[in-house]
Structures are given as structure tokens and as C-alpha cells.
Regions:
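Start-transfer (signal-anchor) and selected internal transmembrane alpha helices
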Residues: 1-29
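Loop-to-helix entry region of an early transmembrane alpha helix in multi-pass inner-membrane enzymes
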Residues: 62-66, 76-95, 128-132
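Transmembrane-helix signature of polytopic, membrane-embedded enzymes
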Residues: 16, 97-121, 140
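Extracytoplasmic catalytic/substrate-binding loops of multi-pass membrane glycan-assembly enzymes
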Residues: 35-46, 56-68, 76-80
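Short acidic/glycine- and proline-prone juxtamembrane loop motifs at membrane-interface regions
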Residues: 124-138
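Short helix- or helix-capping micro-motifs
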Residues: 23, 112-123, 168, 172
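Membrane-interface transmembrane helices that cradle and orient dolichyl/undecaprenyl
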Residues: 102-106, 145-160
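Transmembrane-embedded, aromatic-rich helix segments that form part
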Residues: 162-168, 177-181
Length: 181
């Protein structure tokens, strides 16, 4: 099958590098900016929950408090530690979108670059990368699940189905809504 779009030579590396530079620049900006914002009430709630680890909470799954507990354990109880993993998850989601778009387009890095760039420019996505909440791990695990399901269908290997189930399960620990998406 002929790819829908193919790259040759320097073009392929150019668009890959540009995507990684754009994702890196946005992530560095987010990491700098999150240290200047005060915590929101939801973030403070997740921070309190992180100090009392449990398998579930009254109104939220446990992933975000667990992640905050891990970051706080490494960096101390700071506002930066509470928010640290949101920009990281959003950067990983953009990288996954790049690779998923590359697969879907038949190996083209140009459409993959534009897909990742468009994702970075969505206002809701940009906002979710600044605040600690259920959205950033949900988006990451959902995107990972989509990528793995696509790979399972294309490559016909059971490993991808198992990994997609694991990613969906981790997404379920982030927000129960993932089962309906």
C-alpha cells in the first residue's frame, strides 16, 4: 500500500525536530508559568487527598492524588510539585499524537507535525497543561489507548491489545469517563 504522504531525506528530520522543539518550548513555558500561579480549590483538594492515599475518593479517582503524592515525595510539599506532572503528561500526549498521526498518514512527518502543533494550540488543551487535574492524565492515557488500539489493528499483535487495556485501566484511575469515550 502506498503511503498517503511520505517524506524523504531532510524533510523527515526537519518536521520531527520542529515538532519536538514546539512541544519542548511549550512544556518549558508551562513549567516556568506553573510556579507563578496560586493553587486553585480543586488543586488544593487533590493535594489534601494526596496526603491520605486511598484506592478511591468520594468524588474522584485516585490517579491525580497518587501522582501528586509521588511528585511531592520527590520535590517536597510545594505548589510546583502539585502541578509538575500536568505539563509532563500534556507533552507526552502531544508526542503520542505526533506518532499516531505519522502512523495514520503512512509515515508522513509533515502531517504529524501539524497534528501535534494543532493540539498544542487548542485553548482547553493549553489550559489543562497548567493546572493539576484529572484532564492531563486522562488525555494522556486516552491518547495512548488510541495509539495502541491503532497499532493492534494494523500490526495484528496481541501485545498491543493488552497494552491498550492497561492504558485504558490507568485512564480509568484518572477519570471514570474514559470508559465511555
Amino acid at each position: 500500500m502506498t503511503p498517503l504522504y511520505s517524506n524523504y531525506g531532510k524533510d523527515r528530520l526537519f518536521y520531527f525536530r520542529m515538532a519536538m522543539v514546539a512541544i519542548g518550548a511549550v512544556t518549558i513555558f508551562r513549567l516556568f508559568y506553573i510556579s507563578m500561579l496560586p493553587l486553585t480549590s480543586d488543586e488544593a483538594y487533590f493535594w489534601v487527598c494526596s496526603r491520605h492515599p486511598a484506592l478511591s475518593y468520594y468524588d474522584t479517582p485516585p490517579m491525580v492524588p497518587w501522582l501528586i503524592a509521588a511528585a511531592s515525595g520527590m520535590l517536597g510539599n510545594t505548589e510546583f510539585a502539585v502541578r509538575l506532572l500536568s505539563p509532563v503528561f500534556m507533552a507526552l500526549s502531544a508526542i503520542l499524537i505526533f506518532f499516531l498521526s505519522r502512523e495514520v498518514s503512512g509515515g508522513g512527518d509533515k502531517p504529524a507535525f501539524f497534528s501535534a502543533f494543532m493540539l498544542l494550540s487548542i485553548p482547553g488543551y493549553a489550559f489543562a497543561g497548567l493546572l493539576s487535574g484529572v484532564e492531563s492524565p486522562l488525555i494522556f492515557f486516552y491518547t495512548l489507548s488510541l495509539y495502541l488500539i491503532y497499532m493492534a489493528v494494523q500490526r495484528k499483535k496481541d501485545f498491543y491489545w493488552i497494552a491498550a487495556g492497561l492504558a485504558t485501566g490507568l485512564g480509568f484511575l484518572s477519570k471514570y469517563l474514559i470508559l465511555f469515550i
